[in-house]
Amino acid sequence: MQDFGQWLPQSQTTADLYFSSIPIPSQFDTSIETQTRTSAVVSSEKESANSFVPHNGTGLVERISNDAGLTEVVGSSAGPTECIDLNKTPARKPKKKKHRPKVLKDDKPSKTPKSATPIPSTEKVEKPSGKRKYVRKKTSPGQPPAEQAASSHCRSELKSVKRSLDFGGEVLQESTQSGSQVPVAEICTGPKRQSIPSTIQRDSQSQLACHVVSSTSSIHTSASQMVNAHLFPPDNMPNGVLLDLNNSTSQLQNEHAKFVDSPARLFGSRIRQTSGKNSLLEIYAGMSDRNVPDLNSSISQTHSMSTDFAQYLLSSSQASVRETQMANQMLNGHRMPENPITPSHCIERAALKEHLNHVPHAKAAVMNGQMPHSYRLAQNPILPPNHIEGYQVMENLSELVTTNDYLTASPFSQTGAANRQHNIGDSMHIHALDPRRESNASSGSWISLGVNFNQQNNGWASAGAADAASSHAPYFSEPHKRMRTAYLNNYPNGVVGHFSTSSTDLSNNENENVASAINSNVFTLADAQRLIAREKSRASQRMISFRSSKNDMVNRSEMVHQHGRPAPHGSACRESIEVPDKQFGLMTEELTQLPSMPNNPQREKYIPQTGSCQLQSLEHDMVKGHNLAGELHKQVTSPQVVIQSNFCVTPPDVLGRRTSGEHLRTLIAPTHASTCKDTLKALSCQLESSRDIIRPPVNPIGPSSADVPRTDNHQVKVSEETVTAKLPEKRKVGRPRKELKPGEKPKPRGRPRKGKVVGGELASKDSHTNPLQNESTSCSYGPYAGEASVGRAVKANRVGENISGAMVSLLDSLDIVIQKIKVLDINKSEDPVTAEPHGALVPYNGEFGPIVPFEGKVKRKRSRAKVDLDPVTALMWKLLMGPDMSDCAEGMDKDKEKWLNEERKIFQGRVDSFIARMHLVQGDRRFSPWKGSVVDSVVGVFLTQNVSDHLSSSAFMALAAKFPVKPEASEKPANVMFHTISENGDCSGLFGNSVKLQGEILVQEASNTAASFITTEDKEGSNSVELLGSSFGDGVDGAAGVYSNIYENLPARLHATRRPVVQTGNAVEAEDGSLEGVVSSENSTISSQNSSDYLFHMSDHMFSSMLLNFTAEDIGSRNMPKATRTTYTELLRMQELKNKSNETIESSEYHGVPVSCSNNIQVLNGIQNIGSKHQPLHSSISYHQTGQVHLPDIVHASDLEQSVYTGLNRVLDSNVTQTSYYPSPHPGIACNNETQKADSLSNMLYGIDRSDKTTSLSEPTPRIDNCFQPLSSEKMSFAREQSSSENYLSRNEAEAAFVKQHGTSNVQGDNTVRTEQNGGENSQSGYSQQDDNVGFQTATTSNLYSSNLCQNQKANSEVLHGVSSNLIENSKDDKKTSPKVPVDGSKAKRPRVGAGKKKTYDWDMLRKEVLYSHGNKERSQNAKDSIDWETIRQAEVKEISDTIRERGMNNMLAERIKDFLNRLVRDHGSIDLEWLRYVDSDKAKDYLLSIRGLGLKSVECVRLLTLHHMAFPVDTNVGRICVRLGWVPLQPLPESLQLHLLEMYPMLENIQKYLWPRLCKLDQRTLYELHYQMITFGKVFCTKSKPNCNACPMRAECKHFASAFASARLALPGPEEKSLVTSGTPIAAETFHQTYISSRPVVSQLEWNSNTCHHGMNNRQPIIEEPASPEPEHETEEMKECAIEDSFVDDPEEIPTIKLNFEEFTQNLKSYMQANNIEIEDADMSKALVAITPEVASIPTPKLKNVSRLRTEHQVYELPDSHPLLEGFNQREPDDPCPYLLSIWTPGETAQSTDAPKSVCNSQENGELCASNTCFSCNSIREAQAQKVRGTLLIPCRTAMRGSFPLNGTYFQVNEVFADHDSSRNPIDVPRSWIWNLPRRTVYFGTSIPTIFKGLTTEEIQHCFWRGFVCVRGFDRTSRAPRPLYARLHFPASKITRNKKSAGSAPGRDDE
């Protein structure tokens, strides 16, 4: 296909420029060789007789004809000519013979002499093989080109021409006016067109779609009609005047849709339709300004839009002249009118030197036949005499600059041949039909041309690719030579121009056979031809180069409307330019200085090699040529000139890669039409060298790309044959372009404006991914000053996506809607969406549009709440966690201390309230020591991390079963007694079994020694109680396994001392010289939570060399009558009967002691009457056994209790006398020296501390008060009593007085007692933690206590003072710090929190110091390991991992456990960490933190629960609860996030930072109970998801509930939860019945089940109950209690929702607990006697088994410890609150039964029993006859674990039991008589604690904890391993839903 412009011969007499875009589909045979002959103007070309008609006197006449008979004859005349009415059917002209135009040789000169100005010769480019070469004959340099000669010759005779159109064979001929000579060039298409070689088909095709714009609704001639009919014969083509069907607005929308769907078919169908009756003048007369759409816009425009385009074209001062010429010379094309406003400072070199206002029409002979179609200069009869041809060319072009406002060309981003759709925002492209292409009608090959500005030396505009002085014109030398694939390599003056043609077959899809529609306002090849022909003899600086693309696709652009006027766009290959409307002059003005540019444009330079986009700022006030009009428009003052610019110049590299229509354009309004030579040159240089893409900013009023309907599949495939030839660039003239380095971002110019983006990247995705792109492109765009806008950088979006803000709406929203409605087509296919390849670079739709790697969908990031930490809290945290942070204490002034104390008081109240309520609902969870070693707890915290407690506890049980402890030979079982613990875990002696005698000192003098019981407590009233026994024997250092210090370790439940208590180990010497070391044992307390009582415990430690050990038999034989082996229950009853106080039973049972202030005086009675007689110790006394304590003469247990618990009610009763604590003998009690010393010691220890030891026992001490808190007394306040600092100081004085009193005592240095911090972090003055390593001096002891914070901090660093030396020797140097040793390489996990400088220690040296001070003592029984850790250490990791597989994370945990054990052996030589109990809390914390895998939370758990230090771990439950309750303030949450919707809670360490400074003053007991209650509360009520807020006792103060409640008020009611079903039965009638009935026959109870009816015998005996008091209101309380007990009567699947009045519940909390205390404690419901109504008496007892989805309730029998069924079972632990239970099987039930058994035979009819074990009726008869039932034993968890478990057993619930695995599988037969009178309880079986309690009401939860039990696992007594529950006990709902058929199979562990 040859140059489209070749077969559009131009007349030298025509000077008007016309815009035309002719769509030619693939059906049109484009292989037309045209031969343009211009007799006087055009040529250097050889004239052909076949291509011209003879001249007449008036001008040149051109005729275009084709097979369809379309003929256009254009003549030039001096006068006005008639316009062609496209609405009228023209008369057909007889077909003329079509012949092939001959190829002209350049050997003959043209008729017109060439310009005298020589043009440097350029080298000829080698053409590709197989193609003809079109070479222009070389001429002499002095000979002017023929075009110029012709132009000069014919300038005076320029006339208008007429066109003749032949639609359907009829020829419309219009003669020119007389006097004008119009040579006629005929372009014929005939049969010869097939003779062109097929190689031509490889060249590109340029598809030009045209629409006729008309104000009428009639359909005018369309481009498809003309194209399919071969509209343009080569011989009949008019001189550059082409029919512009692109701008037809008269087409119906259905035609738009048809054209969109099938453009080719549309063209073909309308090829022979005539236009109508309207003339061209009428058509354009009806057009409105700015409303001439192109092919795209015509589809997207509404018919209601004004189409008066002539008014727009003629808006200047010379509108009339232009209108006349337009009507005569422009047929369906936009003639570029002259601009009367001409810049006054135009330079001569720029062809703008002359005022264009004076020469508006000086265009004659400027644009000759060398110019391709679409543009030509309008004929102007008035020519200034001073204008030469060269100047006229530039003037004409300059006129276009000022009169045309659109110059758009944009890159294509089509990536494939298929599915190429027209994209919104794409610019029109400059396409010309290649007439050389013959025989390519099927291939549809098109050519795309680009226009580039190239700077040259002389500053003249010339067409790129022009030859030198010779006749070589690769582009435009001949019509048949300029459009080949040959490229221009030799440009004059080093012009860098590219012209390439490529052809590829279009897709078979007919929608793809329509090439880009070219607006008639497009600067086409014809224009460039004319420029080249006119300026080839002049070394012009300004050249227009045409470049084609290598890319595959040419995407059709669309129109953007501005101010209601369509903005035609043209897009082409690299630097392709379209010149819509009035901007042809831009093609010649390469750079123009703008008078007032507010902002400089920016250029985006794309570098394909790096795939990056760079912004470059152009020079100040510089704008490229095609930007000129847009910039000049900003300064246009004439109201008639309302012009805007919308243009983009796009590289060819991005052609064919656009897959979506989001090609972006930027707009800039033209300013005043003044130009500058320098600026023009500078811009030209930039364009030439960098091949920039010029993209002015988007017009702010333009429509976005999403608002314009798309036109489908208008694109052109371009083959890859493109060859680019480039000459070496010569030095550019003008202002040089600023070069930027790769990756360098230019500095943006101008000020950003609102709604715009300055310097944004303007790039499409495909432009960065096209592999064919090999040249860098740049984009520059400037601001739009007229609209006060700045160029918005927008980038193309992905396929099918629209870029918001890419194009600002240019039309009203209503117009856009109308457009969209008009083009609706139900048959139109959607845009194809191609999937993004993995890792592809895709546009990011951010504000500034950065290019980011595509990584798929980004997850929504959840915001995490943050704690609002105040500076005082942060400072206090540092002080508490870092003992060496004494310098920070300076920041704590009195105001801060006062404020912090107020905060502590607030939290004290919150904690007390929380514990009280939780105690009421969740049961008693006060401290009760478990056995176990420190290593057990360390491994335990490994297992409890990030998993629920039931899984972690099962994992530890599995380890204990897999690696059991090897039995020791010295162990022997002890007799069953209340205070003994056997080796097998039943019960042990009071002081343990491993106690050994050290000589016979204790045995010989035990009877002669009076034991002194001394309770100690710190100044803050901690719950630490020590029972110190002082016996006199020489060399006796201590008792069962603790160091020889009085306050070395308070009892396990007493380690909460916040104040360090200085003890007096070996400080008292008897008269006989015997010294008794008084020591304490941290695990020496035995407590019974079942009866709220405690026993003595003695723990054996690893240091045996200095211990005085004695067996339980020794104690029992010497100190207690053998006949008085009272059981645990008997002791409790004894105490209750002997209680003389007026306290109620529950208050006396509060630790088993009457809490009466009147008994305070008995403190000394119980101590001084030790030698009288012996009574059994009450089990509820939480004494700490130290030293050789003997209890020979206790009057009775109540006296002892009263003596120890004297100070219990000190806070409640302010009338406590001070004399109660004086050491004076009580009347009636003999006072000897020993007892006085004991009394004095006891009194001293009430307030003993590290302060000065001055004697002043003037004030009572609250040590005992806080040591013994009632477990169940509701009359006692749950607030922990604390003493003031004054009392503390007074106690210090009392201690000092005691020391002085015994100043003559001999203290043995070898037995010196070192105190040790037992409570962990003992804070003094509320700020610091004190260590207790203070020796007790015989004479005077320095006052180590100081309220000064700095001194306290310094004292904290004195952890190991005197550990390795004798206390007496080092007593004066008490404040010396222990020697610090370098680290031995042990792993330090992290620096201590809050520590400014981490101190490292040799941990093994620390252990050695402890051993040196205390000796190598043997471990006590309570400190024994639960697992054989040495075996685990030697085992393989896989074996350990398999053992804990059920827990999860087993591999990692197995490695950590083994690494930990290996470290112990490597560092210390053995697996033993018991020495940590005697190390300072800070040192212990640092050591634990150094263990790999332990964090702060885990370390705090070990310290609080095992080491009994002052600590408070914050786990997920605690953190969540504190946030929800509002205890921890949060930073403001986002508006969209409410507290009850919060998912990401703050970091646990931050929560702990806030809490610990406020909780550090609490004692260890309170912290323990608070922690235990909180973790249970988090499992039962405040779960992570769906918390049970309706039943929560804390919801009145809960902010989470308030937030949820406030939100729920606005929400619609939702469906009720499955687990919460409101019962329609009244609550009273539903629940007011007895659960535990033992007076009726047991058989009736056993026979009752869900399958049997209510037997009458169930109600034979009345249900009576004894009220707690005679007051009638207690009946109401009984009703409440009954409601709690029995609420599952009507339907086992229903869980009644009891809505409580929470306000009333909160107010009456304590009174409610007191009123129901008897029932809650141990009210025996089977013995209740009360008259009830007959209705209640008729309610049957609950079922034996009640199955629900989440839990299964079983009615069980409570077995006493002496029950015959328990023979062979381990005896229950004394402190275990849970008894053994018996679960009864229903007859016919099996271990795998999930449903109630049914009768399966007809035994009643036959009278014979079947043998089926699942038949309910037969088995019921058998069991009734045998008087036996089947049952499964339930074992208390503490007893099952033998009282030993990590972390003090907090894994388990206080009421948790295990199902015996053997009896669960094979039930045991139980005689009915054995369970006849046993009380009945309820056990809740489930998979976990949260699932069991999910959805229960407050009463039901309370009943479960106080009356019932929970069970989540089975227990194999043989292997001692956990087992899953059998289906009979509970079958998980999850397994039922998964496989209902396998309901009978054995269930595994459920993970609900």
From Swiss-Prot:
Note accompanying the cofactor annotation: Binds 1 [4Fe-4S] cluster. The cluster does not appear to play a role in catalysis, but is probably involved in the proper positioning of the enzyme along the DNA strand.
UniProt record similarity statement: Belongs to the DNA glycosylase family. DEMETER subfamily.
Basic and acidic residues bias (residue ranges): 709-720, 727-747
Biotechnology: Reducing ROS1A activity may be a potential tool to increase aleurone content, and improve the nutritional value of rice grains. Aleurone cells are rich in an array of proteins, vitamins and minerals.
One Gene Ontology term of the molecular function aspect: DNA demethylase activity
GO cellular component: nucleus
Keywords: 4Fe-4S, DNA-binding, Hydrolase, Iron, Iron-sulfur, Metal-binding, Nucleus
Protein's name in the database: Protein ROS1A
InterPro entries: DME/ROS1 (IPR044811), DNA_glycosylase (IPR011257), Endonuclease3_FeS-loop_motif (IPR003651), HhH-GPD_domain (IPR003265), HhH_base_excis_C (IPR023170), Perm-CXXC (IPR028924), RRM_DME (IPR028925)
Residues annotated as binding [4Fe-4S] cluster: C1582, C1589, C1592, C1598
